[in-house]
Amino acid sequence: MRDVFIVAAKRTPLGRFGGSLTNFSAADLGAHVMKSVLAQAGVGGDQLDLYIMGNVLRAGHGQLIPRQAALKAEIPDTVDGYAVDMVCSSAMMSVINAALTIRAGEGDLILAGGTESMSQTGFYLSHRARWGYKFLMGAPENLTDLLLHDGLTDSTNGEGMGEQTEKLAAEHGFSRIELDEVACLSQQRAAHATESGYFDSEIAPIEITSRKGTQVLASDEGIRSDTTVESLGKLRSAFAKDGVLTAGNCSQITDGAAALLLASGEAVEKYQLKPLAKILGGSWAAGTPSRFPELPITASQKLLAKLDKTLADFDLFENNEAFSVSNLLFERRLGVDRDKLNVNGGAIALGHPIGASGARIMVTLLYALQQRDKTLGLAALCHGTGGGTAIALERV
């Protein structure tokens, strides 16, 4: 099996829901990171064999959003690509698929990642509208919020993912103060990383043109540097009366995109590319839908067994902070040291554009390894309906 190298990695700044990136479609955001990784590597779009992009909230946005993005990025129409929808794991699975394709010898240079505009997610009427409303008496036709329906609700039972996580937190005995401490640390680390310039290498700034002129967004909009455990403690429960989950200890609804350029050893030599890291392997796991926050643990354990490695072999970890519960599970059930986990903050502070987050945490992990002169990193995240993915990187 052939080695797979990461030769470029970029992400957009993450925009708050209804914030600066609201007028950028998922295709626009995807095009921006596609251009950025190609420019970073110094290769043309015509040298790509394939592109694979995660995307979840695509209803009403036209056919094949990754191809829309690729054409906007001036990648030739002779290069094809496809979308992956694995809810929050979409972008990571895109990277895993790209790596498997290269290992199998079916491609040498593949762009993979994910893109999501949660702000541009619309509403829909059911199929009843197509065939005519014969009788509406007692059965009104409501607009359905696609953000909730397709992105944040378990389709197997209609429960919200927040409600499910609230129950899981109670089962594990996680207290409000424990969850708020995780959230506060995320905000503090993200603020420190921003102020210290740690994100500068990974973020591809975006120009935003309006009637007021052109501005450049170069940092994440959701970070609240003044967050304290005390201020978080004043927030009301979000999903259950007297529950432990709040808007402050759950991830933010966000717009953004991230991408990585993967290459075989032959492509590295042919195009004189500079590898940043090697992908050691990826894994996935599934289980009871309502227990989705636990599944990154299973995926990580499978990956460690496959690689014949232990947690002690890894220097840094990223686990997507869909909820503070996610971090506590990763620490207590898997055994990851908090000092090694999400060292530059996570989705609670930065945001969680669901179709892009799997690639975003990989990009952040890669540059965190560089900043700290470390070698091995593992990234993982859960996804709705009961699953999780994990991937391991070795900086070179």
UniProtKB/Swiss-Prot annotation:
Active-site residues annotated for this sequence: C88, H352, C382
GN (gene name): phaA
Keywords associated with the record: Acyltransferase, PHB biosynthesis, Transferase
Protein name: Acetyl-CoA acetyltransferase
Catalytic activity: 2 acetyl-CoA = acetoacetyl-CoA + CoA
Miscellaneous section: Nitrogen-free medium induces chlorosis in Synechocystis, leading to the degradation of the photosynthetic apparatus and concomitant accumulation of cytoplasmic polyhydroxyalkanoic acid (PHA) granules which in this cyanobacterium are composed of PHB.
Annotated source species: Synechocystis sp. (strain ATCC 27184 / PCC 6803 / Kazusa)
Gene3D superfamilies found in the cross-reference section: 3.40.47.10
Nuclease in keyword set: no
Taxonomic lineage: Bacteria, Bacillati, Cyanobacteriota, Cyanophyceae, Synechococcales
